[in-house]
């Protein structure tokens, strides 16, 4: 008998000093057919907690066979609310583009889980994330740009979003939720 979901994924990301500190991400992938668990983790020297939350989802999806049905849990309202169309994709556009490109290859049910609340897999992801950010040799997060060092721009935020086509394709929240199988928070 086929399982309802091919995979169940839990993700977490964090940063020791946000923004600009050492960050890490962690994910646990559960193969629902075999029960096999796969842990994924990594980190960066200079990043943000939100970038690591999105990165955790990307890295997990990159390990999964396309066309499968996934139940995904994240303790990041930033991730879940952005994927269900409640937040606009204003920052971390490089990661959102990657995630959007990956997400369309799957049937994903997006779920929020309360962090640090005793959920075994969420706690495991948090541990993976914390361990990853302490690794001695971390890469620079090339997509991260510390906004404190960016010179003033003449464009308004709206002009910049328009210019760089940064508006997500989620203006119709209901169709976006249906497309990505999002459970409203």
Go through each PLM region and give its residues:
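Intrinsically disordered, low-complexity regulatory segments in eukaryotic proteins
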Residues: 152, 156-163
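RNase H-like nuclease fold core
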Residues: 1-51, 62-64, 68, 126, ...
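RNase H catalytic domain
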Residues: 5-8, 14-19, 55-148
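N-terminal cationic amphipathic segment used for targeting or macromolecule association
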Residues: 113, 154-156, 171, 185
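Charged/polar, low-hydrophobicity segments characteristic of intrinsically disordered regions
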Residues: 87, 162-165
């Amino acid at each position: 008998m086929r399982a309802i979901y091919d995979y169940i994924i839990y993700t977490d990301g964090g940063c020791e000093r946000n923004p600009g500190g050492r960050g890490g991400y962690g994910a646990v992938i559960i193969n629902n057919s075999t029960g096999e668990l796969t842990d994924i983790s990594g980190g960066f020297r200079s990043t943000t907690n939100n970038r690591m939350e999105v990165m955790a989802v990307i890295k997990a999806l990159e390990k999964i066979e396309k066309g499968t049905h996934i139940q995904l849990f994240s303790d990041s309202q930033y991730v879940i609310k952005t994927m269900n169309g409640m937040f606009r994709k204003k920052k971390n556009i490089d990661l959102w583009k990657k995630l959007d490109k990956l997400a369309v290859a799957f049937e994903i049910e997006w779920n929020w889980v309360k962090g640090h609340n005793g959920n075994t897999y969420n706690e495991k992801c948090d541990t993976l994330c914390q361990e990853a950010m302490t690794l001695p040799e971390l890469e620079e997060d090339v997509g991260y740009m510390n906004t404190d060092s960016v010179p003033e721009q003449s464009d308004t935020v709206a002009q910049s979003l328009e210019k760089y086509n940064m508006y997500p394709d989620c203006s119709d929240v209901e169709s976006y939720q249906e497309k990505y199988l999002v459970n409203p928070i």
